[in-house]
Amino acid sequence: MKKNTIRRLILIISLVASISACKKDLKPYDSKLDSDALITQGDLQAATYGAYAGIKAPNYTLRLFWMSIYPGDNAALSGATTDPIYNEYTYTHFPAEASTTNFWHDAYAAIYSANRVIEKIKDGESPALDQLKGENLFLRDLSHFFLVRFFGRPYSQGAGNNIGIPIKDNTKNDLPSRNTVKEVYDFMITDLLKASSLMTVSKDSRFASKEVAYALLSRIYLYEEKNDSAIFYANKVINSGRYSLMATEPYKKYFTLHPEDNPETIFAIRFIPQDNQYYSAIGNQFYNDPVTHATGYGETYASLSLIRLLNQYPDDARHSFIELQRDPVTGDTLKRGNVPKFFMNKFNWQDGIANLSSPVIFRLAEMYLNRAEANAKLGNNQAAIDDVNIIRKRAGLSGSELYTVDDLKGRGSILNVVLEERRLEFFFEGQRPFDLYRNNLPMIRDYPGFHGTDHYNFTVEPTDPQVIWFIPEREMNANPNLIQNP
């Protein structure tokens, strides 16, 4: 029987630090071995690079995005597969699922790496050390946030009193029990407020800064439906002057840019050419180079539901992220099974490499739409519409293509307008299922896809037990203090 992941992290060389120490391709997140003493500022900086490397580990980044994309309604799986994406897509979860087992392990490994640095730095020793401590506090909270989204029910269900995940704020060799969702959220907020006060260096979007902490705070408060606070922290990012929305034409190539060269990106996980994971890259299921046909599987496509939404406005710049595949001779739409091949390219073509990208975690557009959603819920309708239209104008829309308070174009409510715009702006960026369920909305697939028994219709209610994942079986076997999800 394998020991519990959290328990054994104290006994092993830090996974992420050792990887980045021995492989140049993990730069700029390079680090020292965990066995090296953390004595000097240089040691702590190296260990901090190791903490960043933790969120870059393949089973962290890949599973983070796939587990956040496949349960939604923007993707269409085109056939049966033995890959764990089948379970993610069809909601056929089970305790020994590879995706959850691997992500749980790597997320707590990343938390452990951050905790090592946090424990070594006293507040106020120096601005440089305060900065490092703040960065590690953010990294610790980012992993807690992703974990509680996967394994704890939406905060809005039960006011956060449902069971969440174990909070891990130290490197002790223990067997923690699960905290409530509210306890996890409160912990993250306290951490992030401290982190934002400690970080005084405006690092680029490969690294944490106080604005990155504010971005996560805005999202957390939005999930909690503490709308005034969500607006407050969105404003702090927007008004910082550090970021700007890309213009319409450059925006069409947004995801091919290095994050540090992109004025809109707040935080991203930086990959370089040596990192190219080919058929194990995030985008390998969503794209295959139409010229070589040898860069990915390309078996999961943009859903017809999403395409119908985009097609309402043919001049929407966001069409650029979808590539319809046609027969070169007849021009007919290509299909796999009953699913039209709409490739999605948000994880492709950085540095001219088909499967290379630096996945974006936070960008400025989200701050505008966080603010819009919060204002919609507060009844500040004009403010909500104004922010939605900022995003639509950037997408190249104008005139009657914009909303007014008196013309919602059949959407029914300001909130529906905002949520639809979030779908258009962030498709395949890992937000859609959470946006639905935290707003007590069902996930409805009314399009062709390998959904399970019905290949044209599939619905999941927000209260369905399968909205969240099982705690990994090996963790349950080793830790008697854990309680399994129903």
Q: How would you describe each model-predicted region?
A:
Residues 224-225, 231-352, 357-363, 414-433, ...:
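Extended ligand-binding clefts on enzyme/binding-domain cores
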Residues 33-35, 62-79, 153-161, 201, ...:
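Short, surface-exposed recognition loops and adjoining beta-strand edges that mediate ligand/DNA contacts
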Residues 22-68, 297, 311-314, 399, ...:
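Membrane-proximal, proline-rich intrinsically disordered regions
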Residues 1-32, 486:
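Bacterial Sec-dependent N-terminal signal peptides
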Residues 83-150, 179, 194-200, 352-359, ...:
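Conserved, well-structured interaction surfaces
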